[in-house]
Amino acid sequence: MSYTVTLRETDKKKVYVDPGIREGIYLYPGEIKKLKLLEGSMLEEDEFERIRLQYALPRAKHRAIAILAKRDKTEKELRDKLQQSLIDTKTLEETISYVRTCGYVDDLQYARDYIYFKKGRKSFLQIKMELQKKGISSQVLETVFEEEGGQEMEDILMQIK
């Protein structure tokens, strides 16, 4: 299948390559020049996918790792941050899958760490609400709070003895 390329400038740095039928990708002007993409030119689906895999996907992975290098994030927080970077849906999903597979994003571990650092200063209800806002699923919360509830009971028993 062939697409007619539409180039739309989004800001000073990126140009949106819109194939018309499916979601487009963002490329830098230098990349568009290198690829010799012109307004109205025809682009085959496999060529569009090759460009996405060669340019958009590595850039998205690099961006995700840069975001996570500064501070741990939940999957939802990372997804929201990447969407602000004008990353197309398919590339976004592949990037999230990549960082999850590599262990860079782990909502269960994030919730455990968050509870560990906050439990002395905040109630479990406050912590639970904050984690829900951060996009932690109810299933993960249930698992973590079951673990933590058992630990809390052990701590209380140790203090009594």
Predicted regions and their residues:
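An alpha-helical, amphipathic repeat domain used for nucleic-acid recognition
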Residues: M1-K161
